[in-house]
Amino acid sequence: MCWKIIRTTENNGIKIIYNGIPTAGKCETQTGDATQIGTSRFNESYDDNAYVGYMYGTAGSSTYAATHANTNESTIKKYIDNWYKANFDEIATSKLEDTVFCNDRTTKAYDAKTIGNTSFSSYGDLGYGTNVTFYGAAHRASYYSNDSNPSLVCQNQNDKFTIDNQNGNGKLTYPVGLITLDEVVLAGFNTHDSNISDYKDTTNYLYTNSIYWTFSPVMSAGGNATVGN
């Protein structure tokens, strides 16, 4: 298998992203479907704030905590776990760091300083049910941001997906997950509103000419819970 280094971890390990299989024994820069493990929806349903979660609680709940409880596995988590199980054994797993994969579900209401488009001024920070909500990454590293201000800090224990519960939520079965919008920006993509064509830059380190999911919730509005891709 071919991989690209995303960044170092807090414990001096490295995070890597899948980039296809070798061609003639070499891992050249690849694009298109060959760079993906397959295709999957993030969640089958998307009409509630719950569905921005890699795991989620109860749709239709009247509290943030019940909505974002890590009770149900997302569609994409099941898909990734099945791929991992089919391709890696216990020996390989034992050599991998149990690092944090951050599904940052912190909410932040519209702020003109970070999101200048006033058409979003009604977006709040409730984060449950069908309430129109902005999530943290929308302000830091999304198409809607005035500027990029990525962060590798995962604020909530509930959002830190790990196998062990000492440095995270202990909800992962395998040490695998998704890249975040913040990591995408730090790798060179400018996803903010003033430079929306940057994702087409073929010289960018993470360019694949394919759309791929990230871990980062962006918003929930109009019956659509949106995760960055």
Feature locations, PLM:
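Long, domain-scale functional regions
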Residues: 1-229
